[in-house]
Amino acid sequence: MDQVMQFVEPSRQFVKDSIRLVKRCTKPDRKEFQKVAMATAIGFAIMGFIGFFVKLIHIPINNIIVGG
């Protein structure tokens, strides 16, 4: 019986902690959501422009090396 409790107790503690975490979590209000969405959109745009410019630079270099 002691071995069973030794196996079950960590699971029980994890469930208890998880329930406590979910109860403390709150949905973001509209202003906070808009800030997070804007930051994410700006990050996507920056990464897209970086990828575009890297590809723009490497296409002519690749054509010179391979197509030469």
UniProtKB/Swiss-Prot annotation:
Transmembrane segments: 33-61
Record's keyword terms, sorted: Endoplasmic reticulum, Membrane, Protein transport, Translocation, Transmembrane, Transmembrane helix, Transport
SUPFAM superfamilies with a match to the protein in the record: Preprotein translocase SecE subunit (SSF103456)
Gene3D superfamilies documented for this protein: Preprotein translocase SecE subunit
Compartments in which it is found: Endoplasmic reticulum membrane
Extracellular-side positions: 62-68
Coiled coil: none
GO molecular function term, any single one: ribosome binding
Cytoplasmic side: 1-32
Main location: endoplasmic reticulum
Family annotation (Pfam families): SecE (PF00584)
Record bears the keyword ATP-binding: no
GO cellular component terms, semicolon-separated: endoplasmic reticulum membrane
Gene Ontology biological process terms in this record: intracellular protein transport; protein targeting to ER
Domain of life: Eukaryota
Topological category with respect to the lipid bilayer: Single-pass membrane protein
PANTHER family cross-referenced by the UniProt entry: SEC61 GAMMA SUBUNIT (PTHR12309)
Protein family: Belongs to the SecE/SEC61-gamma family.
Function: Component of SEC61 channel-forming translocon complex that mediates transport of signal peptide-containing precursor polypeptides across the endoplasmic reticulum (ER). Forms a ribosome receptor and a gated pore in the ER membrane, both functions required for cotranslational translocation of nascent polypeptides.
HAMAP family in UniProt: SecE
Subunit structure: The SEC61 channel-forming translocon complex consists of channel-forming core components SEC61A1, SEC61B and SEC61G and different auxiliary components such as SEC62 and SEC63. The SEC61 channel associates with the multi-pass translocon (MPT) complex.
Name the UniProt record assigns to this protein: Protein transport protein Sec61 subunit gamma
UniProt source species: Harpagifer antarcticus
Lineage per the UniProt record: Eukaryota, Metazoa, Chordata, Craniata, Vertebrata
Gene: sec61g
